[in-house]
Amino acid sequence: MALRIEDKKAIVAEVAEQVSSALSAAVADYRGLTVNEMTSLRKQARESGVYLRVVRNNLARLAIKGTDFECLGDALKGPLVLALSKDEPGAAAKLFKSFQKDHNAFEVKNLAMSGELFGPEKLDDFAKLPTREEALATLLNVMQAPVTKFVRTLNEIPSQAVRVFAAVGDSK
């Protein structure tokens, strides 16, 4: 069934709104998947905070025009599902990677982040991106390390003195 112009405008507006706040994007070929498998993918996407939409390529090109994901424009060929990571940059890649393990027909085509287009070989790298909390924890550990080492060094001086006095006391 053909879409009316109003429906097309609504789809473009919805996708453009989601794209404007997305951190990363992934597109995959879904040919060969059953309805139940696509429903399962959509459910997993909702649970992981990923916006997932099957959208016509021309409408997707209009929606991403003028955004960081405009680089995906030439990669939109064939029946594709568009996934946008909203909260965590690697969420869409993690979703596609886990789904691809169980479904051979599902093929990731491209990934995009910060205006750069990446091929499917970067899926593992994107999936390994830390969450915001993990990145903050790592940063905090890096910032705390010198202070912690300094405190341990200061604490070692009295400990060493006690060991010296104990050794002197044991020798007498």
Swiss-Prot record:
Q: Would you name any one GO CC term?
A: ribosome
Q: List the SUPFAM superfamilies.
A: Ribosomal protein L10-like
Gene Ontology molecular function: any one: large ribosomal subunit rRNA binding
Q: Which CDD domains match?
A: Ribosomal_L10
Q: Which GO terms describe its biological process?
A: translation
InterPro entries (alphabetical)? Ribosomal_uL10 (IPR001790), Ribosomal_uL10-like_sf (IPR043141), Ribosomal_uL10_bac (IPR022973), Ribosomal_uL10_bac_type (IPR047865)
Which UniProt key words apply to this protein? Ribonucleoprotein, Ribosomal protein, RNA-binding, rRNA-binding
Q: Which residues form a coiled coil?
A: none
Q: Name one Pfam family in it.
A: Ribosomal_L10
Q: How does it assemble?
A: Part of the ribosomal stalk of the 50S ribosomal subunit. The N-terminus interacts with L11 and the large rRNA to form the base of the stalk. The C-terminus forms an elongated spine to which L12 dimers bind in a sequential fashion forming a multimeric L10(L12)X complex.
Q: What does this protein do?
A: Forms part of the ribosomal stalk, playing a central role in the interaction of the ribosome with GTP-bound translation factors.
Matching entries from NCBIfam families are given as: PRK00099.1-1
Give the similarity note.
Answer: Belongs to the universal ribosomal protein uL10 family.
- Tell me what this protein is called: Large ribosomal subunit protein uL10
Annotated source species: Francisella philomiragia subsp. philomiragia (strain ATCC 25017 / CCUG 19701 / FSC 153 / O#319-036)
